[in-house]
């Protein structure tokens, strides 16, 4: 069953006062996006005059500064929410003092607090020496620890890690994960190094972070990112636990995305891709938004294209395929493939593992041109930043752009998509599945017990006794004893009757997190009359939450 904003499921969680009439909300949203005024203006739906906090951040080039890109999006959200933040302050101050306080805290939130730049030597297997460069940026400590991945790439720069760290702050706030934002990068191409050399680099980088106080269970917790995975996270955990964390019982909580044997959690590998799926699901099943786009709700008749067939792209493709959408194109750095009849994710994964590339896949042909401009309903950029620009945005044919990567859309492209009535589901919401499940893993490490272990047998026995109680009640009612009225669980209930596994709990928690956050974004978009500008709505939500922490904590040392 497809939803309209504000119906029973949402009302039961947020309360009727939080949302108002479902019909009125949907009508207001639909009217705004089509450029029609609402029949009767409602509270919160008045158009907002945006303040231009930073004109310099509005870079109009195809390759804008990444950090200024994020700052520009922040400024857009801040200009909208400032009046509400002033209004909500419950202090004995004048209007001017309140506004100064709000603007001051917004200036505190925006910059990157710490950036560590380091270099260290390694001896390679052939006996030569090389100096490795690396960075770690901590954007905000309004919540600790800081959280953010480590990527290995020759494109790593100070600007990139600062931008990604700031995105992590807002991302965590959007999905209510209590972390500050951080990011790290090591400037190497991992394909040019042996496994032994990569282990040396990873362990030495960990020690350099530890010496500077940039890693620890309560300080800064890295995670996998581009070209890193379980193996690298295991090396980091072992290095920290064997050295500076030797006496810390929580040492293995210094990093997430670890193998299960090292304190990892079931469902972490696929978490970001699964989060992308749930994020798309929440909007594609929303009848009001689909009506705006001229589409029918649900995945059944939808086609999609994935740019980037790494961890995020693969698992996004798997889940969309499983729920009825058809993948017609996949793009990688060395080329793209196309099949209008559909591409099976498992077959493509096996082919790439065997051949090292998607090119040559027998059930698809090579796609000439940019896969970003291919004909589809849903486009999932899941590669790197700044892929959708002012140059190619007018040629994008998809009606929904689901940002699986960080920062794939430049501000100018974002503006073009809004003008063309294309829905962009923003990165700071859509790819938050990874950090959400990383949070679950971190909690598991601090609790030193896996999810479900303490309740597994109790739940199974409770379900058994419930069924027996129902059966005995029916037998007493109809005077038949001895099991002549058996109560047989349905197949779906039978799957759950033995209790939830750790993976079940993780998947359920992730789905709920993405659903709740999507509802918050939808409500904010309606409240501020933003229509399809979901990115600004997400930034508004993030800014409100981070602002509240700073404001209530106080700013004594200023």
Curated annotation (Swiss-Prot):
Binding positions for NAD(+)? Answer: 141-143, 176, 252, 444
- Name the Enzyme Commission number(s) assigned to this protein: 1.4.1.3
Q: Which family does it belong to?
A: Belongs to the Glu/Leu/Phe/Val dehydrogenases family.
Q: What name does the UniProt record give this protein?
A: Glutamate dehydrogenase 1, mitochondrial
Which residue positions does N6-(2-hydroxyisobutyryl)lysine occur at? 147
Positions modified as Phosphothreonine? Answer: 410
* Cross-referenced PANTHER family: GLUTAMATE DEHYDROGENASE, GLUTAMATE DEHYDROGENASE 1, MITOCHONDRIAL
Residues the record lists as binding substrate:
147, 171, 438
Q: Which residues carry this modification: N6-succinyllysine?
A: 68, 84, 110, 162, 183, 191, 200, 346, 352, 363, 365, 390, 415, 457, 477, 480, 503, 527, 545
What is the regulatory mechanism acting on its activity? Subject to allosteric regulation. Activated by ADP. Inhibited by GTP and ATP. ADP can occupy the NADH binding site and activate the enzyme. Inhibited by SIRT4. Inhibited by HADH.
Q: What class of enzyme is it?
A: oxidoreductase
Q: How is it modified after translation?
A: Acetylation of Lys-84 is observed in liver mitochondria from fasted mice but not from fed mice.
Q: Does the keyword Nucleotide-binding apply?
A: yes
Q: Where does ADP bind?
A: 450, 516
The PTM N6-malonyllysine maps to 457, 503, 527
Give the species: Mus musculus
